[in-house]
């Protein structure tokens, strides 16, 4: 997993509350567990004018010109600005994979669904909760200013605007450690590889019949 320390990125404003995981990545795309390849189907039902299916050439599909993800000014965004209860619905981890595969590294919202919030940290995505009044302000600034960027500093736990105003955010120490060091569940386990090997060797000597 790629470490996340600071993100100085273009902001994509998704001005919708209660965005559920089926909207983030529709159910027909959940057949793979590779964690990659989901970016073209992020917000699929809103992003394209006709329904999509796995295996389609999505570059040939007609984009919805009214959906914010297709606006040229937001191409290459790394920070998603959202409304309350982002990521509600089913617990599909694919929703986080779709966001990260598209290039999103940070999601800022007034609140998140609990399961989505936990899945985000396990997959290198930083969910930041800011006060709803602050989020309202950020939406106004993003929509009024083309090329609007925010700087997210995980070590300092701040979100800084182009004017230099910094908003603090909370993150658990364990989640912070994992993101800063690029550690998912497998990476955390591999940190103890020497101890695991030593235990296996000891058990093999103590109870060889278990390994026959």
Swiss-Prot record:
SUPFAM superfamilies found in the cross-reference section: LeuD/IlvD-like
Listed GO MF terms: 3-isopropylmalate dehydratase activity
Pfam families: Aconitase_C
Pathway: Amino-acid biosynthesis; L-leucine biosynthesis; L-leucine from 3-methyl-2-oxobutanoate: step 2/4
EC primary class: lyase
Catalyzed chemical reaction(s): (2R,3S)-3-isopropylmalate = (2S)-2-isopropylmalate
Record-listed E.C. numbers: 4.2.1.33
Any one GO BP annotation for this protein: L-leucine biosynthetic process
One cellular component (GO) term of this entry: 3-isopropylmalate dehydratase complex
UniProtKB keywords: Amino-acid biosynthesis, Branched-chain amino acid biosynthesis, Leucine biosynthesis, Lyase
CDD domains assigned to the protein according to its UniProt record, in alphabetical order: IPMI_Swivel
Assembly behavior: Heterodimer of LeuC and LeuD.
Family, per entry: Belongs to the LeuD family. LeuD type 1 subfamily.
Role of this protein: Catalyzes the isomerization between 2-isopropylmalate and 3-isopropylmalate, via the formation of 2-isopropylmaleate.
PANTHER family according to UniProt: 3-ISOPROPYLMALATE DEHYDRATASE SMALL SUBUNIT, 3-ISOPROPYLMALATE DEHYDRATASE SMALL SUBUNIT 2-RELATED-RELATED
Name this protein carries in UniProt: 3-isopropylmalate dehydratase small subunit
The organism of origin for this protein: Thioalkalivibrio sulfidiphilus (strain HL-EbGR7)
